[in-house]
């Protein structure tokens, strides 16, 4: 931070309050590089009460436990079970690894919250933000790759299955694509990683009022949010359109044959593929929007809008949303995979999982049933 920044922090507007000990401000007690790393915006706010830090720490402990256990089981089962090592499931495995990384950095946040501030310093901040960049951007692009895989498999059932080599190239592409956006701020070539909110978490700088910062925010928003979101919407819209058209053709043919349905397994206990795929597509889009839209909007407001809207408490909400989705994903999707549940049932009978052998689900796992787990495991 330059001299102007330090003068701002120690300015007359806070000196009376600080000398009287009336209000503890964010950043109090920090010096040198740690103080210089904090955007001026946060230094104008009072420190949050200890109860806020405690509540967030407890919430993150719960998220961390659920995410590490859930994603850890997905990684273990999918990587050690031969029948689950299909090309499509490599993408599910990569997504679980990224979600695991997302929450593996949570102890830094929990420690900062326990110490009520920027306790880990700049080094811990850089590690936290680097892991967040790789896991966040990588998860978005992996979701886009999964959407492409599902679209290819469902719309071209005869020749749409992706080869193992192609999927591995897609996984490599995800990590290569994420690397510049993760390393450029770390090396301070373009952008930088800074504390945010209660100074217990770190992200890329979206508050410094410079052209370089604004350009970086615009580019990373486009490449890490708009691009994968557009792909996800395009591919899942294509899936829904294809399935609805197929269902309409079946109904028309059944009408011509004067039968109620051409489906052999029609019954109240079995949802049609139309409904299953529509639900999967809607849920995938919703989770991606719910997890990253708040953060994207916050970054845009910080760079181009009214920064006064971004109070420390408000900016903690997007961070919680991202962690919640990393926690929920394995439980909502991969654990619904019939073959995955059967493997859990075999290895961990004490979980009391009741998953009967379902030959229909197994046989159709390449077309409809695999869509939900591959969406955002």
From Swiss-Prot:
Keywords: Chromophore, Disulfide bond, G-protein coupled receptor, Glycoprotein, Membrane, Photoreceptor protein, Receptor, Retinal protein, Sensory transduction, Transducer, Transmembrane, Transmembrane helix, Vision. CDD domains: 7tmA_photoreceptors_insect. This is Opsin-2. It comes from Manduca sexta (Tobacco hawkmoth). GO terms for cellular component: membrane. Residues 79-89, 147-166, 236-283, 336-377 are cytoplasmic. GO terms for molecular function: G protein-coupled receptor activity; photoreceptor activity. Glycans are attached at residue 3. Residues 355-377 are annotated as: Disordered.
